[in-house]
Amino acid sequence: MARLKVQFGTRLKLLRVERGLTQEQLADATDLTIESISNMERGIFGPRFDNLEKIAAALELEVHQLFQFD
């Protein structure tokens, strides 16, 4: 499970940076805290199901695309 959190976090940061968003901007767009975004990106914890749709929408993606790891 820890590996999945790290993979998700790495992917989330990559997608956020590719779109030119700061953690603060993503947090505002998803009604999450900056700390939550930071913790997800560092693999400390993964997103709750209800937040996946918010994150995907803010990044203009489908939810499954958040999990397309290399």
Where are these regions (language model features)?
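Conserved hydrophobic/aromatic packing and binding residues within compact polymer-binding modules
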Residues: 12, 26-27, 37-40, 66
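A detector for short, charged/polar N-terminal pre-domain segments
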Residues: 1-7
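DNA major-groove recognition helix of helix-turn-helix/homeodomain DNA-binding modules
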Residues: 50-65
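Short, charged recognition helix plus adjacent turn
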Residues: 2, 57, 67-70
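Short amphipathic helical patch at the helix-1/turn junction of helix-turn-helix
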Residues: 6, 17-18, 45-46
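Recognition helix of helix-turn-helix/homeodomain-like DNA-binding domains
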Residues: 31-47
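Short basic helix-loop element that most often maps to the first helix and adjoining turn
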Residues: 10-29, 54
